[in-house]
């Protein structure tokens, strides 16, 4: 008998059912910002779904330009970006897998000059000092997270 008898059993999450309990955790591949990154990510993730991964968690995608990991970093804050993200989603779904977008705001670790954070304290690994968010900017950023999540569901 297997030491993990439930590993390959379906898992009902209420809103969806996974074909098994094999999950690929989030990792940044470096393809997210590549000119043909969507196609490359689609092939990368689809191969994992094809070989049995039930749920794939993407690398971090910012909910606003202020939260990208670097200039030109992955962001989902506008419906015009959905076709790019759907390339990846469709590839995984076509192989029988599910995919979840990791929403990631990098805060003071964002390596670009327009970074924001709760306070203007520079990260020890960053040459840029963040702009300290005001109360209204924090509320706007919360809205950015909600919009990103809604767009991710559409993708």
Language-model features, listed with the residues they occupy:
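Flavin-dependent oxidoreductase catalytic cores
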Residues: 1-155
């Amino acid at each position: 008998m297997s030491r993990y008898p439930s590993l390959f059993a379906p898992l009902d999450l209420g809103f969806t059912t996974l074909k098994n309990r094999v999950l690929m955790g989030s990792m940044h591949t470096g393809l997210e910002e590549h000119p043909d990154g969507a196609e490359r990510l689609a092939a990368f993730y689809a191969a994992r779904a094809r070989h049995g991964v039930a749920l794939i968690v993407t690398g971090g995608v910012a909910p606003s330009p202020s939260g990208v990991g670097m200039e030109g970093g992955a962001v989902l804050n506008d419906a015009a970006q959905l076709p790019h993200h759907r390339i990846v989603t469709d590839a995984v779904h076509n192989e029988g897998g599910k995919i979840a977008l990791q929403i990631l705001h990098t805060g003071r670790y964002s390596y670009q000059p327009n970074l924001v954070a709760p306070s203007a304290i520079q990260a020890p690994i960053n040459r840029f000092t963040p702009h300290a968010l005001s109360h209204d900017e924090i509320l706007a950023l919360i809205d950015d997270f909600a919009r990103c999540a809604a767009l991710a569901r559409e993708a």
